Amino acid sequence: MKKFLKVWSVLTIICMTVVVFGGALVTKTGSADGCGNSWPLCNGQLVRLTDVTPEKLIEFMHRMTTGISSIFVIVLAICAWIYMKNRRETKPLAIIAVLFLIIQALMGMAAVVWGQNPYIMALHFGISIICYASIVLLALMIFEVDRKFDARNLVMGTKLRVNIYALTIYTYLAVYTGALVRHEKASMAVPVWPFENGHFIMPTSVQDYVQYFHRLAAFILIVWLLYVTWLVFRDYRRYRVLTFSMVLSLVFIALQAVTGALSVYTGVNLYIALAHSLIITMLFALLCYLCLLASRSKSNRLRIK
């Protein structure tokens, strides 16, 4: 059973990664209306080879991969619930994974049938990364990463725990601003990075405000992440799980900044934009894992005593 769970959890992560990629691809290529206003079929029927368009194919494939991923997520949640029922985090994570998967699908359906609001569609991406993060956490528990990094003895102080919780919430909000940039079609509102012609220009449109707000949010995120990393290396260097996680998070945020800048310089190159979406998804999942470790800190302290 354990071997099956390991294989299945990896396959589920791969499937959810494809879904995240697919959703970003739909947005980047403007394929959201590729299947008309019917759901789950395209214009009320399966795609016929005689009338295939790139937009229709992208949208239909996204729906199909979402359906397949749903099966993987539900099976993983049920099996983890049964096999790891003695772990206190298993049931909440399994419920979150399935619940947010359903919400994500319903929001996608609503957007197709009743039209797309950019602020709601930006939240659609945020829902998907919560589902993704819960699947990653279940997989890490299945692979017993805690034991490999000796995380069972990890004890965090209040300052670090509060910063990790707050940073994770803030990262989610920053992700929302990035998704809003895409859905408000503001990616090239300020075509030079970080500012227009090297100078700050007062925004004159909604797209300008959205773009500037996202860049400000990203800058604060980088500074905050550097601060938390400094805290870890100053006070918790003996815990490999923390030092490794923070180094990895810095790699992610550096790649995120680079792909963000390159997205502007290349006129929103499709592959760079997709990488930009995937990297922040993985960073959010990593921060959620740190939240999981922080939530265990008090019980670890009592157990060690």
Swiss-Prot record:
Residues that coordinate or bind heme o: 62, 124
Reactions accelerated catalytically: Fe(II)-heme o + 2 A + H2O = Fe(II)-heme a + 2 AH2
InterPro entries assigned to the protein according to its UniProt record, in alphabetical order: COX15/CtaA_fam (IPR003780), COX15/CtaA_HemeA_synthase (IPR050450), HemeA_Synthase_type1 (IPR023755)
Membrane topology value: Multi-pass membrane protein
Catalytic machinery residues: 59
TM segment ranges: 7-27, 64-84, 93-113, 123-143, 161-181, 213-233, 241-261, 272-292
Keyword field contains Nucleus: no
EC class name: oxidoreductase
Xref: Pfam families: COX15-CtaA
Chief localisation class: membrane
Complex and partners: Interacts with CtaB.
Domain notes per entry: The N-half (TM1-TM4) and C-half (TM5-TM8) domains are connected by an intracellular loop. Each domain is formed from four-helix bundles and they align in a pseudo twofold symmetry manner. The N-half domain is the substrate-heme O binding domain and the C-half domain is the cofactor heme B binding domain.
Entry's family note: Belongs to the COX15/CtaA family. Type 1 subfamily.
Protein name: Heme A synthase
Organism: Listeria monocytogenes serovar 1/2a (strain ATCC BAA-679 / EGD-e)
Lineage of the species this protein comes from: Bacteria, Bacillati, Bacillota, Bacilli, Bacillales
Gene name of the encoded protein: ctaA
